[in-house]
Every structure is written in C-alpha cells, then in structure tokens.
Amino acid sequence: MTKARASAPEPAHEQPAARVRMSVRAVRTRVAALRRRRPVLTVLALILACVIALVLVDVIALSSRLERFDIAAPAPAPGPQTPGAGAAPAETWLIIGTDSRADAPAGPDRYGTAAEAGDGERADVIALLQPRPDGLTVLVIPRDLTIGPSFFERRRLAASYLSGPQSTVDLLCSELGVTTTHLITVDMAQFARIVDAAGGVDVEVDEPVRDESSGLDLPQAGAQHLSGIDALALVRSRHPQVRRDGEWVALSEEEGAARRSHYTGVVMRAVMTGLREQSRSPLTAHSLAWALTGNLGVDSSTGLTGLVGLARTVLGTGADSVEVVDVPAPVVNNTFVAYPTPQTYAVLARYGYVPGRCRPAGAQAGPGRAG
C-alpha cells in the first residue's frame, strides 16, 4: 500500500486567510441551514444586519462633519464654602457663538466685512447649559463681562476668544469657577442655518425695534416668526432703537446690552422648541442631525454619544422646563466694559459656580483647532 504523503504546512502569512475562508464556509453552511428551517428569520436577520451597517456608516459620517478643537479641560476643586451656593453641576456645556464673518449669511456687508471687524473671532454669545434630571438650565453671560486676576490683567470675555477657546475656558474657570466639561461653538452663518433647520423661531417683542448695525428690523410689536438671519440680527443687536409714541428712540449702551442678553435666552429657548418639533419625524430628525453636525464645533473629547445625550435632554424637555437665567453685569458708563458685581457672583453661585471651585488645566493652548 502506498503511504499518503503529508501535506506541507501552510505559510504563516496565508494562515489568517485560510481561517477566514473556513469561517465564511461555516457561515454559509449555517445560513443555508437556517434558510431551510427558518426562512422568515433569515430575511429578518439580513435586514437587521443591513440596518446596523447603515447606522454605523451614518454615525461615522455624522461624526466626521463636526469641527474639532483641542481643549485641555479644567478640573473641579474643593473651593470655599459660600453661603447660598448650589452644588457643582455634574455637567456644564459651554456654548460660544462667534462673530466670524468668513461665511456671514446674506453677504458679509450686512454684518461688516472681516477687514472691518479685525483679525480673529470674538465670543459674541456665551451661555452655560446645565442638563438636569427634570429639565435644562441656560445661563447667559454678558460678552462684555471683564474679569481677571488683577485690574491690569482683566479681559473681556468676548476678547478672550481671540486667543482661542482654551483662553475663554480658562478665564471662566479661574475667575468665575466654571468647570467646562464640554464646548460647542457656532459662528454667525452656522447659527442662521441651524435656526432655519429648526423651521425658524417664534418670539415675542414688547415694542417695535430696529438696529441698523445688526440688520434688525421688526416694525411691529408682538409675536414674530423669525428666519435664521433675523434671529441672528436680534441676538446681535447692540444699538437698538425702539418706537415709542410714534418716534424711534435710541437706547443706552446698558439697555442695549441687557436686551441682547435677554433675547439671546429667548431665542435659545425658541430654537430648542423648534428642534423638538422638527425631530418628531424620523426622516426630519435625520435631516436635522445632518444639519447640526455640519454647523457645530466641539472639543475633541466630546463625541456623538455626548451630543446625543444632550440632544435627548433638549428634545425631551418641555418649554416650561427650560430655565433661562440672565447673569447680571451692568456696563460701565455706556462703554463696552461690564465688571462683575456681588449680584453677578450670587447668581452664578446659586447654580454651583464659585471662584476657587475650578482649577485651569494649565498653559493656554491657543486656537487649538484639531486636524
């Protein structure tokens, strides 16, 4: 009898491929057997596999649309015991709207050209979002708030962003005790597109108002349905005129700053309401997610999971459960400077922000746009 010759061992680099081929054959055999015994179950399994694959591809695509910033997050510190201070929030989302004119809606001229505005981006809108088990708190901080470790080192929050988002995060931490856990940025054009994606916003204005510098023109008081461009003009209005007794009256710098903070909160609440309404349809919700991820910047440690968690809070919160707080800080003598007052610190402390409760991460990281 002729003795069978032993086959030569397969090369090491081919062994994984061989195992894959064996696995594929095994899967085919099992699927074929399942098809014979459970044809309906087989079809459902294939459909589910396709759906999972599509969802994963969609998640990757959505994540890739976000602009990323490298931010060194501050750390909480024990801090001093302050009477009336609330507990430090579990999460603080820092929302910054910038004044970038690079892609200004309806043409740059309406908002001033980049050359007229100067180099860099300033923080035009600054808000702190605190998700709560029973709702959401939004604290609107005046962009003119001027803070620092000494008189000669004070900076306006708006101007701190010229050195990059890290500078703003660290300044809020060291001087106000704000421990930022997540950062979201949006420029003027992005803000307008988000409002339009939400179907516009419904707001109430107490008197006719206009502002040539921001393009605001609301000739009638009462309920208003605003497009993205008009909502942007409202939250950016700094030198408004209101019509009283048939005449247009210019408001003071202090009144203009107070109205700006107020309507920032009003519009943010209205945007949340609009997003909630638009998200009721799965198809519209997907389109909305696509629009949002393409118009937001986030810190590099915030992924889609964190954004989805925030979205669930926003979309699951009724308008009555959204608390909007205007942090007080009056401007000085019709200037662009507002120093914190005892009332400023008291309001912030009520929501868990106390100087000394936050430790900055370290050296400033500059603009820090991630690749």
Where are the regions a protein language model picked out?
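Non-catalytic, solvent-exposed segments at the cell envelope interface
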Residues: 2-371
